[in-house]
């Protein structure tokens, strides 16, 4: 009879682990701790990160749009298996913006970790302010994700 409480504890732990692993939203990118899912390097700059979340809830993290697009071109996962793509807000590095709501600026002056040199902004106003500082061109998600 002493084994019964251990079984209950094991079931409880498995349930809690299962519920916490089912998060379908973006996960905070931890600089210096998380590794890029494409190049496997440690994520070094919190202003340029990105994430792909699959329909099954798996999260892929990237240190730059260059790695995000490289991962897409690698066909590691099919486009139809992707639930959402998020990019880090350049002005609020801990915020992840859904790809449908972003304004992208490409500029060599941005100097992103892997040379993608693309920053995401959550509003057109923020994009315009940044484009006054960083000479570059406006990009679209469709233009970088094929």
Regions picked out by a protein language model, each given a short descriptive name:
Residues 18-21:
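C-terminal motif of bacterial Sec signal peptides marking the signal peptidase cleavage site
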Residues 23-25:
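Bacterial signal peptide processing site
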Residues 32:
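Short metal-coordination and nucleic-acid-contact micro-motifs, chiefly zinc-binding Cys/His arrays
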Residues 35:
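The −1 position to Zn-ligating cysteines in a subset of zinc-ribbon hairpins
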Residues 38-77:
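Post-signal-peptide N-terminal segment of Sec-exported extracytoplasmic proteins
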Residues 120-146:
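C-terminal partner/receptor-binding element of secreted or periplasmic proteins
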């Amino acid at each position: 009879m002493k084994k019964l409480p251990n079984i209950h504890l094991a079931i409880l732990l498995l349930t809690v682990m299962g519920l916490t692993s089912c998060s379908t939203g973006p996960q905070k990118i931890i600089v210096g701790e998380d590794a890029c899912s494409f190049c496997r390097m440690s994520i070094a700059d919190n202003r340029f990160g990105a994430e792909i979340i699959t329909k099954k809830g798996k999260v892929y993290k990237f240190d730059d749009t260059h790695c995000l697009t490289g991962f897409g071109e690698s066909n590691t996962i099919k486009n139809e298996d992707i639930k959402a793509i998020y990019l880090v807000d350049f002005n609020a590095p801990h915020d992840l913006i859904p790809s449908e709501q972003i304004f992208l600026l490409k500029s060599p002056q941005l100097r992103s970790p892997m040379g993608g040199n693309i920053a995401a902004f959550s509003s057109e106003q923020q994009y315009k302010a940044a484009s006054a500082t960083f000479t570059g061109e406006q990009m679209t998600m469709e233009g970088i994700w094929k």
